[in-house]
């Protein structure tokens, strides 16, 4: 059986990640408080931001920018999205 977490983004119990997505305290926080669904959605948003804004992940400022956008995404705060992106209708 998969583990569940109380997801920070969706404010309900959902399937959790199998392992922390990154090392350190930030990875552990995501592992304990973010659902698999929210993480997968963030990965899609992150990819669009990297491509749209031509982010170089070797640049510490770009990594800090993505970290800040990730926090905003998981906390349901306004976050930058790719220009012209229209979410699919559900």
UniProtKB/Swiss-Prot annotation:
Gene Ontology terms for molecular function: iron ion binding
SUPFAM superfamilies referenced in this protein's UniProt entry, alphabetically: YggX-like
Keyword annotations: Iron
InterPro entries attached to this UniProt entry: Fe_traffick_prot_YggX, Fe_traffick_prot_YggX_sf
GO biological-process terms attached to the record: cellular response to oxidative stress
CC annotations in GO: cytosol
One Pfam family per UniProt: Iron_traffic
Function: Could be a mediator in iron transactions between iron acquisition and iron-requiring processes, such as synthesis and/or repair of Fe-S clusters in biosynthetic enzymes.
Family in the record: Belongs to the Fe(2+)-trafficking protein family.
Stored HAMAP family: Fe_traffic_YggX
Record-linked NCBIfam families: PRK05408.1 (NF003817)
The protein, known as: Probable Fe(2+)-trafficking protein
Source species taxonomy: Bacteria, Pseudomonadati, Pseudomonadota, Gammaproteobacteria, Pseudomonadales
């Amino acid at each position: 059986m998969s583990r569940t977490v109380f997801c920070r983004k969706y404010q309900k119990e959902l399937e959790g990640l199998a392992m922390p997505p990154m090392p350190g305290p930030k990875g552990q926080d995501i592992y304990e408080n973010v659902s698999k669904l929210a993480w997968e959605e963030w990965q899609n948003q992150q990819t669009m931001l990297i491509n749209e804004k031509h982010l170089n992940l070797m640049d510490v400022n770009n990594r800090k920018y993505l970290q800040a956008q990730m926090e905003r995404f998981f906390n349901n705060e306004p976050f930058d999205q790719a220009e012209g992106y229209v979410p699919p209708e559900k």
